[in-house]
Amino acid sequence: LTGYSAYPRLIDFKRMREIADTVNAVLMVDMAHFGGLVAGKALTGVFDPVPYADVITATTHKTLRGPRGGLILCTEEFKEAVNKGCPLVIGGPLPHILAAKAVAMTEANTPEYREYAKRIIENAKGLAASLMKRGIELVTAGTDNHLMLIDVRPFGLNGRQAESAMRECGITLNRNSIPYDPNGPWYTSGLRIGTPAVTTLGMGLEEMEEIAEVLCSVITKTRSLSRNGKKSSKYVLDEGIRESARARVQKLLERFPVYPGIDLDFLRNAI
């Protein structure tokens, strides 16, 4: 079983196939997080699991950019088992969700989608470089895909504190364990951040530079309130930095709206 949800590099699936074959094992790949990059031909050759895996699981959301849901791909050998298993754990499929999945799959087969997948990785590499030049440490010192892991320990923080501080500033990401994490899976020592959503909005390398500035300002101006080595979720974020970060996030979102061309003022007026 191979795949990843928080690994910022690539897996050689040809090598995984060779290893599985040495012990006559089934190779199963979970590409829930990077399936959209495979569909968009941003991951090809040995980094594309489809030619090498016996069974593949994926989601229809995340990088594939469709509604929430999942799918299973398999070779002819496992077709009967998969077809028997799915009806036992899935019930009441919603027609409008099926239609939305069809739209997502259709989009994934277009040149525009392939450009989107390529730009996800370009933006991730740009954001990673911008963070590192500002002194932010990344696990594996960069990324080859759509995500990166920030190590917040050098700033005296744990992941839970840093995640909450970011949320105060209008930034959505999640705390995440890092290799040999001393803080465990609840507090963690890292932050996971990806670029699919901002790429969908139309942001590019210039915006990645600005996002890096905001992230760095929040991390460096957040102070842990942990005492005597005890883990804690409590922290203090400089109020001026919080307001400045929120304002910059708001301006970015105004420049890159979720629904460009649609007037949503009636919603604001209704509140």
Regions found by a protein language model. Give the residues of each.
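PLP-dependent enzyme catalytic core of the Aspartate aminotransferase-like
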Residues: N123, P185-I271
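Short, well-ordered loop/turn and helix-capping segments at boundaries between secondary-structure elements
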Residues: K62, E107, P154, E168-T172, ...
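Structural beta-strand/beta-sheet cores of well-ordered domains, especially the beta-sheet scaffolds
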Residues: A25-L27, A53-I56, R68-G70, L127, ...
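Short acidic (Asp/Glu) and glycine-rich catalytic loops that position anionic groups and cofactors
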Residues: F78-N83, L98, A102-A108, A141-L149, ...
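Conserved PLP-enzyme active-site core in the AAT-like
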Residues: L1-G135
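Generic non-transmembrane alpha-helical segments
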Residues: I19, G126, S130-R134, Q161-C169, ...
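Conserved PLP-binding catalytic core of the aspartate aminotransferase-like
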Residues: E137-L205, F266-A270
